[in-house]
Amino acid sequence: YAGLDIGGTVARMKIEYADGRAGEFYGAGGTMNTDGYEKCNAKYRSFILPILEEAQIKAEDCVKICVAASGIDSPRQEEECRRSFLEMGFRPESILVYNDCEVFLHVSTGPAIVLVCGTGSIAYARGESGAITRCGGWGHVLSDEGSGHNMGMKVIREAANHIDGRTRCPILYELFEAQSGLKTLDEINTFVNDMLMEKTQIASFAPLAEKAYELGDETGLKILRECRDELFALVKDVYYKADLDR
């Protein structure tokens, strides 16, 4: 048996072998709705196939494999994800594919809300009738409020505004400059545009908000509070969308 949790930045795989042993492995993640099939397929294969080879097991021998992947937002993307695992040798009847947030709703029965926030953000809910609804998770351009990418962009904006003389956040700026090596607005602008679809690179600056606050920069706290409020709004929206207020 195998289970995969594939986020935008990190992928995790757990395997239970026939003799009862278990193994856990980590690799690079990917998001189907923004990275696309070709890129995600390459990441899936480079992560999973070496694990199978090292363990001397065949994909076709897997009884069940549950894939909870970021960016599985439509039947087409679900089918593309399934195709990737079929091409690796897993049997059609052994493959289960879910959005990485939706899968948590299957842990219990009855009304529930799940919020997942990593590189991106998404909320799912199951109402009294059993119907499943979602809010958010439509990529870093349309949504992903409060996420690692969103927080990372806020850090970059505040650092840019500090250079531009529009705000003062010297500690946050120094942390950003030390990590990025970027010193001018032109350099920052070029970096952001070059990394527009590389969410992991932008999200890597998110921890600087907390570090800056711990060192006495109130701008760091402002960013943390903004992301907190955005995540709360996401939960509130899916709560009402699922009619859980009735």
Spans of features found by a protein language model:
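Short glycine-centered, acidic/aromatic-flanked micro-motifs in structured strand/loop junctions
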Residues: 69
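Phosphate-binding/catalytic loop of phosphoryl-transfer enzymes
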Residues: 72-169
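Short aromatic/hydrophobic contact patches that present stacked aromatics
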Residues: 66
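ATP-binding/phosphotransfer module of carbohydrate and carboxylate kinases, centering on a glycine-rich
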Residues: 1-62, 84-87, 108-113, 157-246
